[in-house]
Amino acid sequence: MSLLVEIEKQLGNFHLDVRFQAETETLALLGASGCGKSMTLKCIAGIMTPDRGRIVLNGRVLFDSEVRIDQPPQQRRVGYLFQNYALFPTMTVEKNILCGIRSGSKAEKAAALSANLHRFRVGGLGKRYPPPLFRGQQQRG
């Protein structure tokens, strides 16, 4: 994976100014609380728009303020896992997953649900509600 990030973003009194390049499969952003790690990731994923700069992933320009390129999140092929898991607490794990499966027949949705329960290793938790789940289980649900 190749990633180039050179962005700036002003949000209230906070000024984000991030510049790095990585040529590795795994990348970790480390820093103190409130230093801009999540904001940087949101900009890479397209959830938040930088004020200026460039983001290039594997040779694809995702954002470039000078030439007005700003790929929408769904075209970036970047996943973002929110810190707050945004599960509906009154719905089972199965129903939470089904919210993300919008197309297909009833049988196709059931197959996709089963595959996702297995994929995220929460197969035995499908009928449970989110509040009693551990944070890692909520994240995978």
Residue ranges and their predicted role:
Residues 32-36:
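Walker A (P-loop) phosphate-binding loop of ABC-type ATPase nucleotide-binding domains
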Residues 45:
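Helix-to-loop junction immediately C-terminal to a conserved catalytic motif
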Residues 51-58:
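Conserved coupling/switch loops of ABC nucleotide-binding domains, chiefly the family-specific signature
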Residues 60-65, 107-126:
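Conserved ABC ATPase "signature" region
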Residues 62-79, 103-106, 110:
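ABC ATPase NBD coupling module
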Residues 90-100:
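Short coil-to-helix segment of the ABC ATPase nucleotide-binding domain corresponding to the Q-loop/switch region
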Residues 129-139:
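Conserved ABC ATPase signature
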